[in-house]
């Protein structure tokens, strides 16, 4: 799944000119094509990214609020880092 600065709500490329210690977060709900009977295990992988080369690259990727129907994909950066895009793969395992 590819996400970038043209997706509504993307704030990871925004930098106001000071090293704000507060993280910038982007969330995207991922709906499973078929619901699981039980809570699945969700594995994420960062496949690629587009990050400004002027500063240190900082990017966290995690799954939150996992249900039988889907999960919230969360991308987070902080300080000077500007993230213009990220590609994430995911796998949900369960019954």
Give the location of each predicted region.
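Extracellular receptor-binding modules and their adjoining Ser/Thr/Gly/Asp/Asn-rich linkers
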Residues: 1-38, 47-52, 57-60, 64-95
């Amino acid at each position: 799944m590819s996400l970038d600065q043209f997706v509504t709500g993307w704030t990871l490329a925004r930098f106001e000119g000071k090293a704000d210690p507060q993280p910038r977060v982007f969330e995207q709900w991922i709906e499973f094509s078929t619901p699981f009977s039980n809570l699945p295990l969700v594995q994420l992988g960062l496949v690629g990214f587009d990050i400004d080369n002027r500063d240190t690259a900082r990017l966290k990727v995690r799954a939150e609020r996992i249900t039988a129907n889907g999960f919230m994909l969360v991308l987070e950066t902080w300080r000077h880092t500007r993230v213009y895009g990220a590609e994430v793969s995911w796998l949900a395992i369960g019954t």
